Amino acid sequence: MHIPTAAPAPAKPLPIYRQLYFQVIVAIVLGAILGHYEPLIGEKMKPLGDAFINLVKMIIAPVIFLTIVTGIASMTHLRTVGRVFAKAMAYFLFFSTLALIVGMIVAHVVQPGAGMNINPAELDQTAVHSYVEKSHDLTLVGFLMDIIPKTLVSAFVDGNILQVLFIAVLFGIALASVGEKGKPILNFLEALVAPVFKLVHILMKAAPIGAFGAIAFTIGKYGVGSLVNLAWLVGSFYLTAFLFVAVILGVVCRLCGFSVFKLARYLKAELLLVLGTSSSESALPSLMEKMERAGCSKSVVGLVVPTGYSFNLDGTNIYMTLAALFIAQATNTELTLGHQIALLLVAMLSSKGAAGVTGAGFITLAATLAVVPEVPVAGMALILGVDRFMSECRSLTNFIGNAVATVVVSRWEGALDRNRLQLALDGRESELPPPVDALPEALPAKG
């Protein structure tokens, strides 16, 4: 069984004005113009962006549940589930840690906060107080307990990705364990996949409206001028994120036989949607569909993508250490090697506790600084004004990181159709045959 597309691939491309990525580009430009020249009107466009993100969040839980349950239930060897999950977590841990280290190295080399000579006692802490309060809930035990929903229904009502993932994995395993008795249920769930993904395609038609509203609000409320004073920090973050994707993830992609830039081109509509809404969740359903279409096993996609949205946040991790050291430099706070190692270890844990939290990057930073008292939490007031502009870059980097992870784990598992991948990345989707879930369940684990 495979995730169906809404319609067969056309023999020739649609006119550019009918393509989603072009419509989103136009919407972003128009939103930026409105926000810049009519900021009061721009701020009032916020409900458009919020409404679109809510529409997407509405469908995320069913997409994850159906994809994972049908993927696991169709397996004949359940140990495959554990093997794929273990490989995914190993990948996430390595590259998340690497992203934290990269952010720390760049902060030392570029020194974005040096020379500011800010006195933390003179900063207005009221603006960051709400974020600090939310950060108190981000403990490791609290995070682990939050994975288990109070009821089966509450996970879907709250839209908690990790809870839906937890239920889907357990239900998929249970369904596979009962054998033929579970076939009618499996067939029913497989039949539901088509209308659910058709609904995804319908909702995506509203993407330009959502992107327009979100960008108009951002520019209208914060203004491009707010970037000037902290342009060095923002520029350093964007450059670091680009180098992480182009160099580190680029090398990983090359070793796996494809180009990260071609992958980004293949996902251009989704990337523009993430840019416009500043939310990687807004493109989650489309990412799952397109990764399977590009030759990744349905079973791997169903496990890796939703899990990666909580455990593989490369952009957020780069931001955390870079921003923390920026605050230390700006406030003339000396950090020993021991302090920085402690900061790294705390950030590794706290970054996992922000899954599904609005403003996750800023809240996670508050949680990290609260545990590392050497860096003044009050210093967060310095970056509050430009955090919204760094949010887009965090989301884009997180999104690309999860797309790369899906391909890498699929290849590692021997479940990647390389011919389909190359056709998709070369823009020859019209030549693609229907996808087949090629997970080699009966084979022993590789590498």
Swiss-Prot record:
GO MF annotation, one: succinate transmembrane transporter activity
SUPFAM superfamilies xref list: Proton glutamate symport protein (SSF118215)
Pfam families (UniProt xref): SDF
Statement: the UniProt record of this protein carries the keyword Glycoprotein: no
UniProt membrane topology term: Multi-pass membrane protein
Family annotation (HAMAP family): C4_dicarb_transport
PANTHER family assigned to the protein according to its UniProt record, in alphabetical order: AEROBIC C4-DICARBOXYLATE TRANSPORT PROTEIN, PROTON/GLUTAMATE-ASPARTATE SYMPORTER
Protein name: C4-dicarboxylate transport protein
Originating organism: Stenotrophomonas maltophilia (strain K279a)
